[in-house]
Structure formats: C-alpha cells, structure tokens
Amino acid sequence: MARVKNGIVHVARRKKILKKTKGFWGTKKSNYKKAKDTLRKGMMYATRDRKTRKRDFRSLWIVRISAALTGMGINYSKFFESLKKSNIKLNRKILSNLAIEDIETFKKIVYEIKN
C-alpha cells in the first residue's frame, strides 16, 4: 500500500491560519507557529470582549443618563424607580440617546415622572 503524505491538506491548513493573521505585526503573521498561537490568543480576547462590550455599553448609558439627570435635580435610582411606576417603557439605550441628542424630549420625560 502506498504511503499517504497528506501534503495538500497540510499546506492548506497552514495557509488558512496565515491568511487569518494577515494584519499582525512581525513574525506573528509569517511564522506559522507564532501565528497559530497569536491567533488562538486573539480569538480568546475576541470572545471575552464580546461579553465585556455589553457591560461597557450599559455602564456608558447609565453614566450619560445620570449626568443629564443631575442638572435636573433628580438622581438615577429615583428616576428609574419613578419610570417603572409611571409605566414608561424606554430602555437605557434610548434614554441615553435622548439625553444627548434630544434634550427637550428628555426633559419632558423627567417632568412627566416628577409629577
């Protein structure tokens, strides 16, 4: 029986890794061994940061809403408590955008909640 060297698959596998590491710096893009390790680590960071991004954006929205509310004499926790009681169904992302881009509408919402 003939010996199978598997050369085509071997080259294709290496090519696939090196193609994914195209924008990396130095030997991390051309040396297969380093490229493979760097790519694996990069994928780990990507997975971790997809989870972290959600937390970061939520924190950003809360900070923006809180900053807009301090000028109006109400704090964040009281605002959200009143928001839920008055049955206004706006999420933090929408409220954050309103606080930055359309301050008049945001003020109307705060006024509605205060009364």
Swiss-Prot record:
Q: Name one GO biological process term.
A: translation
* Database matches in InterPro entries: Ribosomal_bL20 (IPR005813), Ribosomal_protein_bL20_C (IPR035566)
Q: Which organism is it from?
A: Borrelia turicatae (strain 91E135)
Key words, A-Z: Ribonucleoprotein, Ribosomal protein, RNA-binding, rRNA-binding
Gene Ontology MF annotations: rRNA binding; structural constituent of ribosome
Q: What is this protein called?
A: Large ribosomal subunit protein bL20
Which SUPFAM superfamilies does the record match to this protein?
Ribosomal protein L20
Q: What does this protein do?
A: Binds directly to 23S ribosomal RNA and is necessary for the in vitro assembly process of the 50S ribosomal subunit. It is not involved in the protein synthesizing functions of that subunit.
Methyltransferase as UniProt keyword: no
